[in-house]
């Protein structure tokens, strides 16, 4: 059996652009008829997506699967760590929760996770022509190298070549690329085949001889200077979301999401933010809710602690004040649970006990050990009979005596809404109906997935022009016609 061609993108730091580059390469290869699949051995994120095979993976791999034209599958991200507290994370293996670990214990637990990681990787290699692997953080962490399954430890175990990515937009890209190479031991360094300078603004000629000097000192070729793509908006797992500032200009509708400590799935608001006439920002302090037309309580990885934080920080009182003056509120997943009358945890999912909710929706939640994972396609009755799609990821069952419609719960006065559906606002007809009903704003109601697809095409175009053709040809991209 012919083994799939494999390549791993590692970065000099977190946020170097690995996720987007893998997504762009997936789209580029798929456009040229290459059967390509993404893979990330270990991910740490509370932004997760439900897969077609009934599990969950990081949103980054969901995006990369979309770029490759594939349904997301749990093999694409076999180990997902979802932080619940400062030093504790839920461990998801091949799509399903296997337990919880403290940070110290995870070091010892990594090596037993390597077999399922390799099992998932090998299945993808058997099914596709190319498998593009994304690393995590930086490989130049000598304290983490032993037992590593996220970067060079995986690359060694699976015998995968590496391209190293540095972000010039942060500054110091040449030092970070060369420094990363210097920190690697000889065997790991030999695995690095190429360097990429990412997110450059301006003409590459401005770099002068610096790339050549980097090649000479590091012994590894620079195969591309990738420009920053103007106004590129793709879902990101760990993007530095925009904190609340002064009210936007031009009379835009102000949507403010509460950024509690264990917030999850902040990208649920991307489709709203893409609407003309809508401005989305995030708030951590009560005063930052001032001027909001709509307040959103997003998902939460630990509902009890985030609910307590709302009260202790003064956010709850600011939310009540917003409602008294006619403001609108939406709660998604954990946000829905917090907006209800109360939450019970009889089986200790979050430590046990109970807590009163904010009392803004006539619902009550009981947490349960079994996690609900489902892709959802259906119809909402309010604010209009329209189709909705999304997915559910939650521990808990929420019931109501009244005010509960298919997919949404609504307060008696119609100003507070809650739903378990992540990506609810991606449903264009629902989003437009809500903006009209609440704010008389004629939203565009565009297809969010179509918007993302167009952005992926822009990114793929950029990579095809920026990376050296010979290196792309080795992955299956035909040479560009000469001009």
Swiss-Prot record:
Signal peptide: none annotated. Pathway: Cofactor biosynthesis; adenosylcobalamin biosynthesis. Residues 252-430 form the GATase cobBQ-type domain. It comes from the Bacteria. The active site is at 333 (nucleophile), 422. One of its GO terms (biological process) is cobalamin biosynthetic process. GO terms for molecular function: ABC-type vitamin B12 transporter activity; catalytic activity. Keywords: Cobalamin biosynthesis, Glutamine amidotransferase. SUPFAM superfamilies: Class I glutamine amidotransferase-like (SSF52317), P-loop containing nucleoside triphosphate hydrolases (SSF52540). Belongs to the CobB/CobQ family. CobQ subfamily. HAMAP family: CobQ. Catalyzes amidations at positions B, D, E, and G on adenosylcobyrinic A,C-diamide. NH(2) groups are provided by glutamine, and one molecule of ATP is hydrogenolyzed for each amidation. PANTHER family: COBYRIC ACID SYNTHASE, DETHIOBIOTIN SYNTHETASE. NCBIfam families: cobQ, PRK00784.1. This is Cobyric acid synthase. It comes from Halorhodospira halophila (strain DSM 244 / SL1). The lineage of its organism: Bacteria, Pseudomonadati, Pseudomonadota, Gammaproteobacteria, Chromatiales. The gene is cobQ.
């Amino acid at each position: 059996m012919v083994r799939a061609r494999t390549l791993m993108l590692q970065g000099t730091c977190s946020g170097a652009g690995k996720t987007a580059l893998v997504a762009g390469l997936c789209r580029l290869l798929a456009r040229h008829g290459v059967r390509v699949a993404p893979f990330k051995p270990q991910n740490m994120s509370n932004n997760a997506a439900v897969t077609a095979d009934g599990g969950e993976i990081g949103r980054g791999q969901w995006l990369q699967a979309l770029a490759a034209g594939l349904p997301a599958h749990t093999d694409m991200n076999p180990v997902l760590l979802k932080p619940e507290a400062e030093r504790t994370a839920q461990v998801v293996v091949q799509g399903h929760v296997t337990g919880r670990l403290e940070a110290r214990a995870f070091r010892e637990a990594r090596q037993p996770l390597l077999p399922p990681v390799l099992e998932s990787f090998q299945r993808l290699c058997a099914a596709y022509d190319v498998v593009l692997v994304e690393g995590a953080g930086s490989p130049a962490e000598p304290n983490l190298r032993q037992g590593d399954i996220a970067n060079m430890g995986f690359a060694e175990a699976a015998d995968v070549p590496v391209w190293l990515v540095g972000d010039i937009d942060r500054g110091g890209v040449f030092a970070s690329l060369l420094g990363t190479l210097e920190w690697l031991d000889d065997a790991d360094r030999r695995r690095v085949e190429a360097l990429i300078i990412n997110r450059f603004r301006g003409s590459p000629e401005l770099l002068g001889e610096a790339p050549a000097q980097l090649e000479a000192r590091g012994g590894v070729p620079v195969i591309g200077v990738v420009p920053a793509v103007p106004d590129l908006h793709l879902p990101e797992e760990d993007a530095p979301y925009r904190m609340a500032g002064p009210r936007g200009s031009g009379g835009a509708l102000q949507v403010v999401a509460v950024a509690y400590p264990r917030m999850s799935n902040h990208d649920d608001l991307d489709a709203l933010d893409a609407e003309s006439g809508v401005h989305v920002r995030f708030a951590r302090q009560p005063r930052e809710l001032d001027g909001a037309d709509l307040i959103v309580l997003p998902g939460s990885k630990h509902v009890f602690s985030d609910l307590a934080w709302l009260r202790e920080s003064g956010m709850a009182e600011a939310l009540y004040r917003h409602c008294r003056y006619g403001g609108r509120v939406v709660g998604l997943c954990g946000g829905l649970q917090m907006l209800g009358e109360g939450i019970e945890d009889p089986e200790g999912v979050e430590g046990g006990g109970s807590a009163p909710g904010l009392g803004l929706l006539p619902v009550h939640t009981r947490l349960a050990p079994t996690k609900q994972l489902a892709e959802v396609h259906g119809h909402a009755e309010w604010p209009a009979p329209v189709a909705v799609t999304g997915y559910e990821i939650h521990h808990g069952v929420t019931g109501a005596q009244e005010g509960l419609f298919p997919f949404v719960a609504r307060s008696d006065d119609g100003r507070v809404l809650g739903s378990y559906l992540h990506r609810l606002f991606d449903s264009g007809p629902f989003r437009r109906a809500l903006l009209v009903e609440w704010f008389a704003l004629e939203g565009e109601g565009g297809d969010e997935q179509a918007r993302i697809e167009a952005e992926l095409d822009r990114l793929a175009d950029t990579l095809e022009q920026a990376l050296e053709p010979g290196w792309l040809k080795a992955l299956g991209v035909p040479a560009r016609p000469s001009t």
